[in-house]
């Protein structure tokens, strides 16, 4: 199979990368009706598989799960997930032939094998659904021409898909139809009904493309969403320990600080996050973030380039073929870092203290979001897609760090995201350690400025505020957040 994106000419590539339209709520007036009375069979019952299935069933759809016979015989976790929630479970041979829509929600590395197995069993004119387009775009999977291929991609982990639905809301979602597989012209109707069945239409749906979803998703998760949190946690912890800050306090400041800081992002963007700082701290965070952007821009652009060309995917798939030797080795190394093993403490850190003593963390967030957004849009990805794959998802990923440090983040994200995270963090960590952290002190990470006055020059503050507010990620973010007025706090235990 050849990389699908690389088979397109330049005009086609740019067209696919630039597909993104915020759909009007009126386009979902019939909600999930198009799929009612039809048989939906989900392959895979992990976090996305189970929670999307629960939502779809509650929306009136006929949902069952097709699992490998071995998973059924051995009653593996996927089987238990489905059966304990009252779903019908059967083998591929039992359920796939009667399915009108087969939804493949298995891990990326299993997609080729799964699709090659189920496709011969699918009835003529059925539809095949994905929630991530890697198999189509990067692996170039060829789907039978009578099959309609669609995507519904919620922009958050599966557990959040369910929780937001239960609140009567939903999560922002991308939908797409594969241009090579829409024989009856009803791909969009299928995708719209599926998205509505998960509740996504209540939070906002972007009509996108398989290409735009994959390229932007890979870029976001490798850099700001995961890689920057991992690299930042490691180097900031090292700095605080080296300068005599208590290990328990240092670890807690980072583990829970990312979540607290990025929650401000979710509600008011970078502007609101920076406004949580005192004026002197805001100016300092701005200066640090400008330095970070200059230092890290080449690394962000390199990752974007490798994603666009397919170099990243081919490298990762080679590791798949080698029994994940690199992935597993990097996972073990991460588990041995000092931050992952800091001693638990019962020290209480008030919310504002995470900002006051985490000025560098704020700077890293601002720099990382803007760099990822800029790299994506410079490559032809439209601003709405770039926003969702950078700023919007960051609080959700930071929440996983708050639960069980980097281990939890890497467990929750896909293997594809985890592999890309390590590629980025393995370069970003020594880069920050050697070229940046030597010039900062614990006044920006761990202790705070300790200023006695909030005074800064008017001219400086005006420049800082105007620069922050005029960045394209802030402008598009303000518009998109307007569609999500019913957001909840994501903090652990809240």
UniProtKB/Swiss-Prot annotation:
GO biological process: isoleucine biosynthetic process; L-valine biosynthetic process
Catalytic activity: (2R)-2,3-dihydroxy-3-methylbutanoate + NADP(+) = (2S)-2-acetolactate + NADPH + H(+); (2R,3R)-2,3-dihydroxy-3-methylpentanoate + NADP(+) = (S)-2-ethyl-2-hydroxy-3-oxobutanoate + NADPH + H(+)
Active site feature: 132
Domain KARI N-terminal Rossmann: from-to ranges: 14-208
Co-factor(s): Mg(2+)
Residues annotated to bind substrate: 414
This protein's UniProt keywords: Amino-acid biosynthesis, Branched-chain amino acid biosynthesis, Magnesium, Metal-binding, NADP, Oxidoreductase, Repeat
Family annotation (Gene3D superfamilies): N-(1-d-carboxylethyl)-l-norvaline Dehydrogenase, domain 2, NAD(P)-binding Rossmann-like Domain
Enzyme Commission number, as recorded: 1.1.1.86
Family: Belongs to the ketol-acid reductoisomerase family.
Any GO MF annotation of the entry: magnesium ion binding
Role according to the record: Involved in the biosynthesis of branched-chain amino acids (BCAA). Catalyzes an alkyl-migration followed by a ketol-acid reduction of (S)-2-acetolactate (S2AL) to yield (R)-2,3-dihydroxy-isovalerate. In the isomerase reaction, S2AL is rearranged via a Mg-dependent methyl migration to produce 3-hydroxy-3-methyl-2-ketobutyrate (HMKB). In the reductase reaction, this 2-ketoacid undergoes a metal-dependent reduction by NADPH to yield (R)-2,3-dihydroxy-isovalerate.
UniProt keyword Magnesium present: yes
The protein, known as: Ketol-acid reductoisomerase (NADP(+))
Gene: ilvC
Keyword Metal-binding: yes
Taxonomic superkingdom: Bacteria
Binding, Mg(2+) 2: 217, 389, 393
Binding positions for Mg(2+) 1 per the UniProt entry: 217, 221
Cofactor binding note: Binds 2 magnesium ions per subunit.
């Amino acid at each position: 199979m050849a990389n699908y994106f690389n088979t397109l000419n330049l005009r086609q590539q740019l067209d696919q990368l630039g597909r993104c339209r915020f759909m009007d709520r009126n386009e979902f007036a019939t909600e999930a009706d198009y799929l009612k009375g039809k048989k939906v069979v989900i392959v895979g019952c992990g976090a996305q598989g189970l929670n999307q299935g629960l939502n779809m069933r509650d929306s009136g759809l006929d949902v069952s799960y097709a699992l490998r016979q071995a998973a059924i015989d051995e009653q593996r976790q996927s089987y238990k997930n489905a059966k304990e929630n009252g779903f019908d479970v059967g083998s591929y041979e039992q359920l796939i032939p009667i399915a009108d829509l087969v939804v493949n929600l298995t891990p990326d590395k299993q997609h080729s094998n799964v699709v090659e197995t189920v496709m011969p069993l699918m009835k003529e004119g059925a539809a095949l659904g994905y929630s991530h387009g890697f198999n189509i775009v990067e692996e170039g999977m060829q789907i039978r021409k009578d099959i309609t291929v669609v995507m519904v991609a919620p922009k958050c982990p599966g557990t959040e898909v369910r929780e937001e639905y239960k609140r009567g809301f939903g999560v922002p979602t991308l939908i797409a139809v594969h241009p090579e597989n829409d024989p009856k012209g009803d791909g969009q109707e299928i995708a719209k009904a599926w998205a509505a069945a998960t509740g996504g239409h209540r939070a906002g749906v972007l009509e996108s493309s398989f290409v735009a979803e994959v390229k932007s998703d890979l870029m976001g998760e490798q850099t700001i969403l995961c890689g920057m949190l991992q690299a930042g946690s490691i180097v900031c912890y090292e700095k605080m320990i080296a300068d005599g800050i208590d290990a328990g306090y240092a670890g807690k400041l980072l583990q829970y600080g990312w979540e607290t800081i990025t929650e401000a992002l979710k509600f008011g963007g970078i502007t609101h996050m920076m406004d949580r700082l005192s004026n002197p701290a805001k100016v300092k965070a701005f200066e640090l973030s400008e330095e970070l952007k200059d230092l890290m821009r080449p690394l962000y652009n390199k990752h974007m380039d490798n994603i666009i060309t397919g170099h990243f995917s081919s490298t990762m798939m080679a590791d798949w073929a080698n029994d994940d030797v690199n992935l597993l080795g990097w996972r073990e190394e991460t588990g041995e870092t000092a931050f992952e093993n800091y001693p638990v403490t019962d020290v209480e850190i008030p919310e504002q203290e995470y900002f006051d003593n985490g000025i560098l963390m704020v700077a890293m967030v601002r720099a990382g979001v803007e760099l990822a957004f800029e790299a994506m849009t410079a490559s032809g990805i439209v601003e709405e897609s770039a926003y969702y794959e950078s700023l919007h998802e960051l609080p959700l990923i930071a929440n996983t760090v708050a639960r069980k440090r980097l281990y939890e983040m890497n467990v929750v994200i896909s293997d594809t995201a985890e592999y890309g995270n390590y590629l980025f963090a393995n370069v970003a960590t020594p880069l920050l350690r050697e070229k940046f952290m030597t010039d900062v002190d614990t006044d920006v990470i761990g202790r705070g400025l300790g200023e006695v006055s909030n005074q800064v020059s008017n001219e400086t503050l005006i420049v800082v505020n105007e620069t922050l507010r005029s960045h394209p990620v802030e402008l598009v973010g303000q518009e998109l957040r307007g569609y999500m007025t019913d957001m909840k706090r994501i903090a652990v235990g809240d």
